[in-house]
C-alpha cells in the first residue's frame, strides 16, 4: 500500500476506531485485570481473525505484547521483585525494581525523564525537577493505557507518568501496586534480574 492511500484511508475516519477493535480492546482491559495465558491466547487468536492489516492493528499488537510481559513478570514474581542495577545517584541505597523513560503530561511543562521505582519510593528524574513519592503515602496505583497513575492517600495529588509502551505501563503499575502493598510491612524479597 502506498503512502497516499494509507493517508487517505486514515483521513476518511479520523479518530474513529472500528467497533470490532473497540470490543477487542474491552476484552484486553478485562484480561489485564485478571491476566492469564489462556486470556492472552484467546486475544491473540481473536486479533488474528479480525482480518485487519498489521498496520491497522499495530497498537493492539503492542497491547497484547504488554499483557504477555505482565504475565511474565507475575510468573517471576514468586521469586520476588526484580532488581535492576542502576548507578543513578538519586536512588542512593534503595533497591531499584523498575526504570523506564516517561513524561508527565499533566504538568505545565510536560517534562520528560525517567521513572524509577525503588523499594521505598517512586522517583521521577527529568526536566527541571525531581519528584519523589514514598510508597507509604500512595493510596492507589494503577494503569490507564500507556500511563502509570499514582494517587496519594490524601487524594490531593495525582501523578501521571506516560510510558512509551503498554508493556512499561502495565509492568510499572503492577510493581507499584506490589510496592504500595508492602510500603509499611517487612521488606520484599527480591530476585536479581539478569
Predicted segments — roles?
Residues 2-16, 21-33, 37-112:
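Anionic N-terminal interaction surfaces
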Residues 3-10, 127-194:
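Acidic, Ser/Thr- and proline-rich intrinsically disordered linker/docking segments
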Residues 96, 115, 148:
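A broad, low-specificity signal marking well-ordered, structured residues that form hydrophobic/aromatic
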Residues 101-107, 120, 153-155, 163-166:
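Generic structural motif
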Residues 107-127:
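Conserved beta-hairpin
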